[in-house]
């Protein structure tokens, strides 16, 4: 049985997976161990660890109630990482996928779990060299987490479109705003959580899956959004890692604001109909970003993802003011109004220079704030 470790509602944290690149041609490089060795010479107290392949590193914030404090922590973590990277002549970058790396060149990081993943999933494990942002929102109970997971599913296309930063893959313009999520689609336990009504029903489902030998823990579910019982949170997993930490923090604040709205409006009940249009809306967000179409499964009406986001921001105005997230929502609103995503910025960088290496150089300069 899974125990849900109840946490303070609306606390939040983010995890960011970062690209490690060389400074010759800005391809990925196996630098995570060297980076960690330098970083761990200081007693920094931050959560910085390797990821599934050696050209990735993950940073995770502490638990926060205030997005401004979260930005301050991420800024300090960035300074620590950039100092270490400079000593090794390495670059660090955001972005959901490296524009021209080849998956077969990657090497699995040597931990027991990653070896098991590699043995089970074969080449998919190396293809998992993609870079995402995960957002955690605290919940008072397992029942609250199940409800919030279903309600936030409606806004998953928002998070995809707002964070989209992976237009290139293996040297090719994919025509997608976020190509990263297609790498995750291949895993058999990706997609969405089944439509269960409460924590007891979820436990029944988990126990069945465990007895069938399909899963051993919650880590085996690669769902877009899932409860995280050991943290007492709901975890949104669809975001590409943004090019800048300010965007990452704003996305966390948006999730916090949405969650506050849903917690306050207890009359809003999840409906299974949300999932009728889920895959369609998700694809539209990945392929077209802000310009994608979004079908409301309840009303049957269709709008652009851009317009739906702006309407949601308007709906959340009072909640954002109460929570103190107005500035973060405004940052995202201005991005939406400009119609420019990180993916568009990367395409423009490539068009200007004609070189994907130079585009990654600029991408790295943005994250490292150099």
Curated annotation (Swiss-Prot):
Enzyme class name: ligase
Keyword Nucleotide-binding included in the entry's annotation: yes
Molecular function terms from GO: ATP binding; glutamate-cysteine ligase activity
SUPFAM superfamilies, sorted: Glutamine synthetase/guanido kinase
InterPro entries: GCL_type2/YbdK_subfam, GCS2, Gln_synth/guanido_kin_cat_dom, YbdK
Example GO biological process: modified amino acid biosynthetic process
Sorted UniProt keywords: ATP-binding, Ligase, Nucleotide-binding
Key word Transmembrane helix present: no
Known EC number: 6.3.2.2
Pfam families in UniProt: GCS2 (PF04107)
Catalytic activity: L-cysteine + L-glutamate + ATP = gamma-L-glutamyl-L-cysteine + ADP + phosphate + H(+)
Function: ATP-dependent carboxylate-amine ligase which exhibits weak glutamate--cysteine ligase activity.
Protein family: Belongs to the glutamate--cysteine ligase type 2 family. YbdK subfamily.
Protein name: Putative glutamate--cysteine ligase 2
Organism (species): Herminiimonas arsenicoxydans
């Amino acid at each position: 049985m899974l125990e849900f470790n109840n946490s303070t509602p609306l606390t939040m944290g983010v995890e960011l997976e970062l690209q490690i690149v060389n400074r010759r041609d800005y391809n990925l490089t196996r630098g995570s161990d060297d980076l960690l060795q330098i970083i761990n010479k200081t007693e920094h107290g931050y959560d910085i660890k390797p990821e599934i392949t050696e050209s990735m590193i993950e940073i995770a914030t502490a638990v926060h109630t205030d997005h401004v404090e979260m930005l301050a922590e991420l800024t300090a973590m960035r300074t620590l990482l950039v100092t270490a990277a400079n000593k090794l002549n390495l670059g660090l970058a955001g972005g959901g996928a490296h524009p021209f790396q080849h998956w077969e060149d990657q090497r699995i990081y040597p931990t027991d779990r990653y070896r098991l993943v590699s043995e089970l999933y074969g080449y998919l494990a190396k293809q998992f060299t993609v870079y995402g942002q995960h957002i955690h929102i605290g919940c008072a109970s397992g029942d609250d987490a199940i409800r919030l997971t279903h309600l936030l599913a409606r806004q998953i296309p928002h998070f995809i479109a707002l964070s989209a930063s992976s237009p290139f893959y293996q040297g090719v313009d994919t025509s997608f705003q976020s190509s990263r999520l297609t790498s995750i689609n291949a895993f058999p336990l990706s997609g969405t959580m089944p439509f269960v009504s409460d924590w007891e029903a979820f436990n029944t489902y988990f126990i069945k899956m465990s007895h069938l030998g399909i899963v051993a823990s919650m880590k085996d579910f690669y769902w877009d959004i899932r409860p995280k019982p050991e943290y007492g949170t709901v975890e949104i997993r669809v975001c590409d890692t943004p090019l800048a930490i300010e965007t990452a923090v704003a996305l966390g604040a948006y999730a916090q604001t949405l969650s506050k709205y849903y917690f306050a409006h207890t009359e809003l009940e999840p409906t299974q109909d949300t999932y009728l249009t889920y895959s369609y809306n998700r694809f539209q967000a990945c392929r077209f970003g802000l310009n994608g179409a979004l079908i409301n499964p309840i009303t049957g009406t269709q709008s652009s993802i851009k317009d739906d986001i702006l309407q949601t921001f308007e709906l959340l105005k009072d909640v954002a003011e109460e929570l103190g997230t107005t500035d973060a929502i405004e940052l995202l609103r201005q991005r939406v109004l400009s119609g420019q995503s990180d993916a568009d910025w990367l395409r423009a960088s490539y068009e200007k220079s004609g070189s994907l290496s130079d585009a990654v150089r600029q991408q790295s300069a943005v994250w490292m704030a150099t």
